[in-house]
Amino acid sequence: MILEKIKEKKREEIRQLLLTANVAHMKKKILELPPARDFRKALYNQGQVSLIAEIKKASPSKGLLCPNFDHRQLAHIYQSNGAAALSVLTDENFFLGKLTYLEEIKQQSSLPLLRKDFILDPVQLYQSRLAGADAVLLIAGLLTPGELSQLFLLCREIGMQALVEVHTQEELQRVLTTDAKLIGINNRDLSTFQTNLATTAKLLEQVQIEDITIVSESGIAQKEDIKFLKSLGVHGVLVGEALVTAQDIAKKVQEIVVAGGRGEA
C-alpha cells in the first residue's frame, strides 16, 4: 500500500533529521520568530468559500503534474488572482517537493502558508515553524490519538495552527474530541487514491459548523464543485492538481475564487 511506503520512508527521514537536529537550539530560535500569520482567519469570509492554492509538482498516483514547475511563479500567480492562503507540498520522495520551496515562498508572499507533508514527529513541527510555515497538516489517519493530541498541542505551543485532516467518520469523531477548530475533509481515500466529493457532504452532517472552520480537500476541479461545496457551508477548499495542470493557471484560480463568492456582486 502506498501509504505504508510513505510512512516508512518518512520515518527514515525523521531518523536522519534527529541525528543532526539540535532540538534545544531549534526551540530557542522559534522564540525569536515573529508571530505566524493567521491561517484560519484568512479562510473565514462569511458566505464565501476561500481558496487554499497548492504548490504541487507531482503526486504518487499521477507522477509529474507540472513539467515547467516554478514554485515562486506559482505563488505569485495564486496570490495576485485571489487565493486566500497557500499550501506548499514539501515531501521529496513521493511529491517531488522541497522544504526550501516553503522558505523561499515565505520571503515573497504575504499569504499564510500551510506546510503539507506527512507529519509524524515533533521535530518536524520545529522544522516547519523555522522554515516559515504558519500552519501544518496533521493527518488523523496516520496518527494514534496520543500522537495527534501531542502534535496538535505542540503546534499551538510554538505558534502554528494545525489543519487536522480526516477521511472517515471514525477519524472525525476522534478529532472532534480535541480542541481542533480547523478541520480538513479529504475526499481522497489515501488507501486507494480515489476521490469523491460526497465524502465532505457525509462528514459535514456530524459537525457543528459554527464552531469549526471546514476545508474540503482533493478532487476539486470545476466551478460546479465549488458551488456544491459552498451549498454545504464549507469555508475553504484546497486545490492543487486542477491549478498546476490548467492551460491558463491565472484564469483557473479566478474561476475558483469567483465560484466561491469572492468577486461576485
UniProtKB/Swiss-Prot annotation:
Gene3D superfamilies: Aldolase class I (3.20.20.70). Keywords: Amino-acid biosynthesis, Aromatic amino acid biosynthesis, Decarboxylase, Lyase, Tryptophan biosynthesis. NCBIfam families: PRK00278.2-4 (NF001377). It catalyses: 1-(2-carboxyphenylamino)-1-deoxy-D-ribulose 5-phosphate + H(+) = (1S,2R)-1-C-(indol-3-yl)glycerol 3-phosphate + CO2 + H2O. GO terms for molecular function: indole-3-glycerol-phosphate synthase activity; phosphoribosylanthranilate isomerase activity. Belongs to the TrpC family. GO terms for biological process: L-tryptophan biosynthetic process. PROSITE patterns: IGPS (PS00614). This is Indole-3-glycerol phosphate synthase. Pathway: Amino-acid biosynthesis; L-tryptophan biosynthesis; L-tryptophan from chorismate: step 4/5. It comes from the Bacteria. The keyword Transcription does not apply. Its EC number is 4.1.1.48.
